[in-house]
Structure formats: C-alpha cells, structure tokens
Amino acid sequence: MNTEATQEKSNVNSTGERLRTAREQMGLTQQNVAERLCLKLSTIRDIEEDNSPASLASTFLRGYIRSYARLVHVPEEELLPMMAKQAPVRDAKVEMMQSYSLGKQRKKRDGWLMIFTWLVLFVVLGLTGAWWWQNHKAAQDDLVSMGDQNASVEEDGRQSIALSDDNANGGAQTAIPLDNKPATANNAPSSVTATSDNGTPAATAQSSQVTASNAAPAANAVNDNTPPVAVAPSQAATNSSAAAPLPTGSAAVSRPAADANAMMMTFSRDCWLDVTDATGKKLFSGIQRSGGKLSLAGKAPYHLKIGAPAAVQIEYQGKPVDLGRFIRTNQVARLTVGAP
C-alpha cells in the first residue's frame, strides 16, 4: 500500500505528468499546445514523457517547460524541483574553433600565391631587361661598325690622295728629249702633204717643203744648243687632246633620261649612310657632309642604313620618305624604300 502511494506520488511529482494533467483539465490536446507555443509536436511529447533529447540543450528545454506551465496555469515554483531532476543544467561541449586553423591554412595559401606572383613579376622584369639590353647592344654594335667603316673610308681616301701625289711627282721628273736629227723637220711636211686631197693643197704642201728645207739648218742649230725639256704626262695628254680635231657635226648631244627609281637625299648635318639596291649592289657607303646632296639610281627596292635619321631628307620618285619613327626613338634607321 505504501509502495503504490509512493509510486503515485512520484508520478505526480513528475514534470511531464503534472503538465499533462493540467492540460487535460483545460481540455487541450498536444497539438493545441504545440500550435500555441509554436513548438513541434514531438517536443511537447518529449516534455510530457520526461524525455531530454540529446540534440536539445537543457536551457532551451527548461524554457519550453516554463512556457508550457504558464499556458496550463501551473506555478513555476511547483515545477522547479522537478525540472532540476528532469532537465539538469549540463555543461555544454565547447568544440574547438577552427578559425585559427582555417586562418593558418588561408595564410599559407596566400603566402604561396604571393610567392608565385613575385616570381612572375621577376620573370617579366628579367625578360624586359634582357630585351632592352639586346636592343642597346645592337645599337652600340651598329655605332661601332659605323665608326670602323668611317675609319676605313677615310684611310682609303688618304691612301688614294697619297698615291695620286706620288704619280704626279713621278710624272714631273720624267724628261722627254728632243730629237736633234733633221729628219723630224723633214718628216713634218710629208705628214701635211698626206692630208691634201686636190691640187691646191698639194701646192701648199710643196711650198711648206721648201720652207721646211730652208729652216732645217737653223732648227738643227737650235736643237744642238737646246737642253732636253721635261714634259709632264698630264701636259702631254692635254696637248694631244688639244691637237685632236673636235667633231663639228650637227648631231644633237644625247642626254640620259631621268630614272624612275632615282632617289635624292639632302643632308643637313654630317651623317653616315649605307645604301644597297635589290640586286645587293652597294650604291653608297660612307659619310655625307653637312649641306651635301646625293642622287642614287639602281634597282628598287633600296635598303638603307642611316646613322642620324634627323640629318637626312629623302625623296623617292618625287615624294618625301617619312623618317619620323626613327627620329623619335633616336636610333639607327633601317628601312626599305621602293618596296612594292
């Protein structure tokens, strides 16, 4: 008898039983309570059956019980001792936050990304520097080759001038002795006689023979006392050309027609220049002085190398050639003129 009373008392002292009894007295169903408290029907059943779901924190469970008690008009002080048994306060498991590890992984990943970015940047800078150095070295090599070619051209010019001076001095020292024999004077009239074609020139030739025979002793006397006269080769060539008869024909002097591929260059300053035509023939290579003009004609297109593009004005077929891009960069101009 005492056992049944104790069991009944324990049932009454149960939180879920007390709330269910109060609900039934008010004529409410579990569905009505769940709708009014905005809870799940399974949560109301767990409260009335004194179950403590593991997925539900004890703090929330105690709050649901208090809301249920207020709904069915059960004092909270009556339920507090029973709630301590049914829903004891449990220490919540605090899981280790992974923010530190995630931040560490993110930092590591960002570190690799920064290393890769810097590596790409260094590669780009290295390639840019190598490209600039190659262009600078090529320009320096061109300048050195221009200087060597200029030196060789000047050396060739000095050698040619020295050679021409030697030839002039050697020619001035050669002497041509005059023939002292009277045969020279006697032979002169015969050459004049050979040029006559009719009777009148023949008579003139005979008179010249008489004059020559009379003048022969005097000429011989003069020749005996006259020393040899030195005659330069240039003077001999001048005399021979002066003695040669000039043509007096009425034929007009022919002039070459203007070349359609002619190229004219005007120089405002000293400039090194190298020009070849389509056949590979070198039309010019050397230095042009300030104020000079150069006209070239060959087979187009022409391949030009200009040391100072700002010092040259080029006209091809009467049209100016644009050198602006080379002047702006201040580099040696390499261009092709007259390409189809």
UniProtKB/Swiss-Prot annotation:
Span-the-membrane segments of this chain are 112-132
What are the DNA-binding region positions?
30-49
**Gene Ontology BP, a term:** regulation of cell shape
Q: Does the keyword Transmembrane apply?
A: yes
Q: Which Gene3D superfamilies match?
A: lambda repressor-like DNA-binding domains (1.10.260.40)
The way it spans or sits in the membrane comes to: Single-pass type II membrane protein
Where is it mainly found?
membrane
Q: Which residues lie on this side of the membrane: Cytoplasmic?
A: 1-111
| HTH cro/C1-type domain segment(s) | 19-79
Gene Ontology cellular-component terms listed: plasma membrane
Q: SMART domains per the record? A: HTH_XRE
Tell me if Hydrolase is a UniProt keyword of this record.
Answer: no
Q: Which PROSITE patterns match?
A: HTH_CROC1 (PS50943)
Stretches in topological domain Periplasmic: 133-340
Cellular compartment(s): Cell inner membrane
Q: Where is composition skewed (Low complexity) in this entry?
A: 202-233
Amino acid composition bias (Polar residues), ranges on this chain: 183-201
List keywords of the entry alphabetically.
Answer: Cell inner membrane, Cell membrane, Cell shape, DNA-binding, Membrane, Signal-anchor, Transmembrane, Transmembrane helix
Q: Name one Pfam family in it.
A: HTH_25
Question: CDD domains from the xrefs?
Answer: HTH_XRE (cd00093)
**Domain note for this entry?**
The helix-turn-helix (HTH) motif in the cytoplasmic domain of the N-terminus is involved in the formation of spirals to maintain the rigid rod shape. As this protein is anchored in the cytoplasmic membrane, the HTH motif may contribute to protein-protein interactions to form the RodZ helix, which is localized beneath the cytoplasmic membrane. The C-terminal domain may be critical for determination of the rod shape by probably interacting with enzymes required for synthesis of the peptidoglycan layer, including PBPs in the periplasm.
What does the record give as the function of this protein? Cytoskeletal protein that is involved in cell-shape control through regulation of the length of the long axis.
Q: Which family does it belong to?
A: Belongs to the RodZ family.
List, alphabetically, the HAMAP family matched.
RodZ
This chain belongs to the protein called Cytoskeleton protein RodZ
Q: Which gene encodes it?
A: rodZ
